[in-house]
């Protein structure tokens, strides 16, 4: 009888542990959803794409620091943060970025804001091309100039498909990064019954960008 009760207790504890792990994971990956939605709306981006980028960059760890000085949820560099502050005319934040960029970039909402601003700049670079998401993501990871290089075609040629563009990425880590985000983004949109589109409400006049 004792062993039977012990087995039942262990099963219950195991079930509680599994349920707890599941709900904690759901909390962890969705606790910034409101911030993502708010900033994505300002910069007229699809929040699911922004979410997918953050998932890949840091798995929602706001304190993560990259090997090249990237900081926070979207792994923003101080240089990009200073560019954002200068272009948006936020003098107080520009001064803060000069004094202590780490403090600004560790703030989850500021980090998401700057990351969305940068993604919108990349959207504007490639907006007329099919599969703009792939170009945006590649530029976010490897820099806009490399994304432009990979996107080049002969004069008069058809624009590259997503598959053709990804195949041209000659940095393995960037190719894996782009592929992973696109697949996660696609699955997320399928779960929600929507189409993959990098931006939302592009005819709106809200937002700021390059």
Go through each PLM region and give its residues.
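N-terminal Sec-pathway targeting helices
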Residues: 1-18
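Export/targeting segments at the very N-terminus of extracytoplasmic proteins
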Residues: 16-63, 67, 85, 109-112, ...
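Second-shell loop/turn segments in exported
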Residues: 22-25, 38-39, 62-71, 97-109, ...
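Extracytoplasmic/secreted envelope proteins and their assembly/folding machinery
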Residues: 33, 37, 47-51, 73, ...
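Surface-exposed patches in mature extracellular/periplasmic domains of secreted proteins
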Residues: 49-51, 93, 126-138, 161, ...
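Cell-wall polysaccharide-cleaving catalytic domain and substrate-binding groove, primarily
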Residues: 55-80, 143, 185
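Substrate-binding/active-site groove segments that recognize
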Residues: 68-96, 114-118, 160
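Catalytic and substrate-binding regions of cell-wall glycan-acting enzymes that process beta-1,4-linked
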Residues: 134-194
């Amino acid at each position: 009888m004792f062993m039977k009760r012990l087995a039942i207790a262990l099963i219950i504890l195991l079930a509680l542990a599994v349920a707890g792990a599941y709900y904690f994971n759901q909390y962890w990956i969705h606790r910034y959803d409101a911030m993502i939605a708010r900033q994505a709306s300002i910069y007229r981006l699809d929040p699911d794409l922004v979410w997918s980028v953050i998932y890949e960059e840091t798995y929602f760890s706001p304190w993560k620091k990259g090997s090249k000085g990237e900081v926070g949820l979207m792994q923003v560099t101080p240089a990009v943060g200073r560019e954002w502050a200068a272009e948006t005319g936020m003098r107080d934040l520009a001064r803060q970025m000069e004094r202590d960029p780490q403090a600004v970039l560790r703030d989850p909402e500021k980090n998401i804001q700057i990351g969305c601003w940068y993604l919108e700049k990349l959207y504007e670079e490639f907006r007329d091309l099919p599969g703009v998401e792939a170009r945006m993501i590649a530029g976010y990871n490897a820099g806009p100039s490399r994304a432009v290089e990979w996107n080049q075609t002969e004069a008069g040629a058809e624009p590259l498909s997503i598959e053709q563009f990804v195949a041209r990425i000659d940095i393995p880590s960037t190719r894996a990064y782009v592929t992973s985000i696109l697949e996660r983004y696609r699955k997320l949109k399928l779960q929600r019954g929507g189409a993959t589109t990098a931006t939302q409400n592009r005819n709106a006049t809200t937002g700021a960008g390059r």
